[in-house]
């Protein structure tokens, strides 16, 4: 079977890598791909941009692709699933209408409110003065979100009213996010711990994937601006069995039935970004309509089932008949980025050490390319995700950072504390069992 994976990030490298494990897969085309997918077993790249829907469809038809899997949100919101389906091509992902769950934060908040799904209080504004008046009335901390797609960087957690006002002006007047910032969502600040809850959905049924937790802020200690994600681990210990059942009952299943009721049934990967409060009550912070990045990388390290089997079950409406099997060991991924990300990064620098990695480490490429001499060079802000399994999160972290230590380029940087919340929990459990040391 021949597959097409659309995208060029670490998520797409991880999806292609896992799909290549299927005995039924003969070849995977990754469009446009990166230096990692260019050399991955069974994979080859095709130089077609994710925004070129006609070009991607022509590629799939020319190559007689059996199934297409879409990685990033941009082509989904643009309607690539509608485009492929109209041409009779099998593709896994939501329609443009269903993808508005991520494409518009205002749409998502209205959907949540309409269907009684727990989320933060909110208001939507297009006028600067009205938005600022709202913020002054509510006070800080408060959350300001650009309505549209902003590559994971359109959320400002303002700790002061002054900071909130500046964010509003940047989005509505300063054009900081272009059309994506033409509307803003002002949200109640929620206390608690975040987690990523991703499910496969076939339109009617939802199959939960492994839980995970990412690290949005650029610097250690969860400080600095938001990024697309600086690392992740799976599973997320905050999601206990009880909370897992509650998320399915109160959030995931009502979302699936709500989309059906609204006439926009959802098929694809449904990502619920959650805040879990001290009482274990989950609320939706955001929806994404695709696998998370970098959550995909540690999740694919743990997935023991054939991913193609799961995707085919979803396409056939049979997710209620399958289960996903997971390695019980945790996995952790550390993103290596290029300075000064999340600002425009320095690119074109040769990466060394890729041929000398520890055996228990897998490196998923994101912002990489091959230069004229065949060397792997930096080509984006988030460059690599160094991923490893371990008997616990502490061990997975040690393995991943051992891999990081063997990789080098001039302007590389990474956080040094990926997994800190889970590791703190492990240490607490050890102290409770053995007493103070």
From Swiss-Prot:
- State where Mg(2+) binds: 286, 288
- For the ligand (ATP), the binding residues are 135-196
Family matches, as InterPro entries: ATP-grasp (IPR011761), ATP_grasp_subdomain_1 (IPR013815), PreATP-grasp_dom_sf (IPR016185), PRibGlycinamid_synth_ATP-grasp (IPR020561), PRibGlycinamide_synth (IPR000115), PRibGlycinamide_synth_C-dom (IPR020560), PRibGlycinamide_synth_C_sf (IPR037123), PRibGlycinamide_synth_CS (IPR020559)
Q: Which GO terms describe its molecular function?
A: ATP binding; metal ion binding; phosphoribosylamine-glycine ligase activity
| Top-level taxonomic group | Bacteria
**Domain ATP-grasp, chain residue ranges per copy:** 109-316
Q: Which UniProt keywords apply?
A: ATP-binding, Ligase, Magnesium, Manganese, Metal-binding, Nucleotide-binding, Purine biosynthesis
Q: Which GO terms describe its biological process?
A: 'de novo' IMP biosynthetic process; purine nucleobase biosynthetic process
Catalysed reaction, written as an equation: 5-phospho-beta-D-ribosylamine + glycine + ATP = N(1)-(5-phospho-beta-D-ribosyl)glycinamide + ADP + phosphate + H(+)
Kindly give the Pfam families that the UniProt entry links to this protein. GARS_A, GARS_C, GARS_N
Cofactor(s) required for function per UniProt: Mg(2+); Mn(2+)
Keyword match Nucleotide-binding: yes
Free-text remark on how the cofactor is bound? Binds 1 Mg(2+) or Mn(2+) ion per subunit.
State the EC number(s): 6.3.4.13
**What pathway annotation does it carry?**
Purine metabolism; IMP biosynthesis via de novo pathway; N(1)-(5-phospho-D-ribosyl)glycinamide from 5-phospho-alpha-D-ribose 1-diphosphate: step 2/2
Matching NCBIfam families: purD
The family annotation for this protein states: Belongs to the GARS family.
The protein here is known as Phosphoribosylamine--glycine ligase
